[in-house]
Every structure is written in structure tokens, then in C-alpha cells.
């Protein structure tokens, strides 16, 4: 069956922003109780060490996604952008991102692209927060890992969506 390509770019700056926002809100919630130490450890900051650790967690999440979605992803030699373009640059920049190039049948439902894009982003954010909390707030880490893993079946389902063939059109 004929194939087509879809590309989804996940921006690193947006990932860092969402991670910072979610961890800030979690620390504020913890602070409303008597958990001041947990609140201080829960939030991320802009220190080089913190960004470096989060960046490594983001890389791990992207690598896991590539393994899970491998049957849809082009080989590395065919799609140049699929390689880790951030390999040696730890600094957070808005322009840089991870490009997922998927090979899908022509009858793939393009209505699923927004959901897939959002789910990939959410998976990476939840996985990175889970990794962060594994070091700073172990009680919360498993909840974020579960949220990340819970997105995978939904991503698989969205990747399997197809449109019906109509008479007079080619596949």
C-alpha cells in the first residue's frame, strides 16, 4: 500500500515551559500543607544543573517514544531531522526541537495529527517530571510515569485511524 509522511515537531522550549509550570503548581500545592521541604524540591528552576537533568530526562523520553513508535518512524538514514539535533547543545532554545517523521498509509486520518502531537508532548513532559521527582519527590514519581505510559495506547489508536476509501479516488 502507498505511504505518505507526516512530520511532528516537539519544541524543547515548550517542553521546558510545561515542566516548569507543572512542577511549580505541584510545589505550590505541597506548600499549602506542611510539606515545605517537598515543596522546595518539587519545583524546577533555571539553574544549569536543573536544566541539564531535565534535558537528559527529555532525551530519555524521546528515545522511549522512538522505540514504542518504531514501526511508524522512518529509518534514521532516510529522514535526516529524526536524528537527535540537540545532542551536544544543552541550552534551552525555542527554535530547536525533536522531529518525528512518521510513515503512514495514504488513508491515514489526518484528523488524528493534532491528538498525536499533543500526546507526544504530554508523554515527554510527564516522563521528564517523573524522572525529576524520582530524584526529588519519589512518592509522586510513579504517578507521572503512569500518566506517561497511559498515553501510549491512545497514541497507538490514533496512529491506526484510517479514512474510508471513496470511489474514484486513488490510495
Where do the protein language model's features map onto the residues?
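Conserved short "hinge" loops at termini or chain/domain junctions
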Residues: 1-113, 147-171
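Short, hydrophobic/amphipathic alpha-helical patches that form generic packing surfaces
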Residues: 63, 122-135
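Short conserved catalytic/interaction loops centered on acidic-Pro-aromatic/His motifs
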Residues: 137-147
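Structural motif
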Residues: 113-122
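C-terminal or internal capping secondary-structure element at the end of a domain, subdomain, or sheet
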Residues: 136-138, 153-154
Amino acid at each position: 500500500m502507498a505511504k505518505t509522511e507526516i512530520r511532528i515537531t516537539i519544541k524543547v522550549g515548550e517542553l521546558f515551559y510545561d515542566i516548569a509550570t507543572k512542577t511549580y503548581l505541584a510545589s505550590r500545592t505541597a506548600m499549602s500543607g506542611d510539606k515545605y521541604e517537598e515543596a522546595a524540591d518539587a519545583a524546577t528552576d533555571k539553574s544549569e544543573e536543573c536544566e541539564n537533568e531535565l534535558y537528559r530526562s527529555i532525551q530519555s523520553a524521546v528515545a522511549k517514544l522512538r522505540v514504542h513508535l518504531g514501526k511508524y518512524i522512518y529509518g534514521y538514514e532516510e529522514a535526516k531531522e529524526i536524528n537527535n539535533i540537540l545532542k551536544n547543545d544543552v541550552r534551552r532554545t525555542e527554535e530547536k526541537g525533536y522531529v518525528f517523521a512518521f510513515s503512514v498509509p495514504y488513508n491515514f486520518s489526518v484528523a488524528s495529527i493534532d491528538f498525536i502531537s499533543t500526546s507526544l508532548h504530554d508523554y515527554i513532559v510527564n516522563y521528564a517530571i517523573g524522572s525529576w521527582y524520582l530524584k526529588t519527590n519519589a512518592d509522586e514519581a510513579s504517578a507521572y510515569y503512569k500518566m506517561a505510559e497511559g498515553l501510549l495506547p491512545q497514541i497507538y489508536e490514533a496512529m491506526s485511524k484510517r479514512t474510508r476509501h471513496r470511489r474514484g479516488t486513488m490510495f
